[in-house]
Amino acid sequence: MFDTKALQAEQRQRASEISLHDGIDNQFVRFIAGADVGFEQHGEITRAAIAILRYPSLALVEYQVARVATSLPYIPGLLSFREYPALLAAWAQLQQRPDLILVDGQGIAHPRRLGVASHFGLLVDVPTIGVAKSRLCGDFLPLHQDVGAVQPLFDNDEQLGWVWRSKIRCNPLFISPGHRVSVGSALAWVQRCMAGYRLPEPTRWADAIASNRPQFQRWLRKNPDFLGKRRDMI
């Protein structure tokens, strides 16, 4: 059994350490990472991927994958405890450290203000942004169907982030700061990382690698000599 109350208390404590002030010097951002987690063997293995893209070209320069035994079952609201061990293992393998990380998941748009983007950002002390595919908490006004439509995401009077339609006929993204990024800058950075898909390029790559998707396998076959990979980890 897991002490969920103790983990929730830890979340509240760590959330108090989150900074929503920009820790990014826009003129000196050279590398942006995407981070995502998938699961193998019916959830027994956590597979984390971190993709490093050069900015502003958004060209992939490195990726790392780590597999670790899953230490926590799926518990709503405590997902970051399940995911961060594998993320830290992938982080430790990186040759190029990023200036900013976009994480597939929530930042402060979380009932206790500590989604995986915030938790991971605190642990590695790098600016992070949560880019989630669904809402965990907060309310927003109806969103127009046009590309670029945006509404603030609020919990009572506190703005947690943004709801942004990045692609037509697609569900919106839920964007919130993780750590060392302001609410306003979170949306702007995600918008700078788009390349015509629903997801920004950093998390689109990380999602494909973490889940070992067919498009990633096709890319591997076309790029067998890519220097940024760790072939033994795939």
UniProtKB/Swiss-Prot annotation:
Transmembrane portions of the chain: none
Residues that, per the record, bind Mg(2+): 36, 104
Entry's localization field: Cytoplasm
Major localisation: cytoplasm
Catalytic activity reported: Endonucleolytic cleavage at apurinic or apyrimidinic sites to products with a 5'-phosphate
HAMAP family on file: Endonuclease_5
Family membership noted in the UniProt record: Belongs to the endonuclease V family.
Protein name in UniProt: Endonuclease V
Organism of derivation: Yersinia pseudotuberculosis serotype O:1b (strain IP 31758)
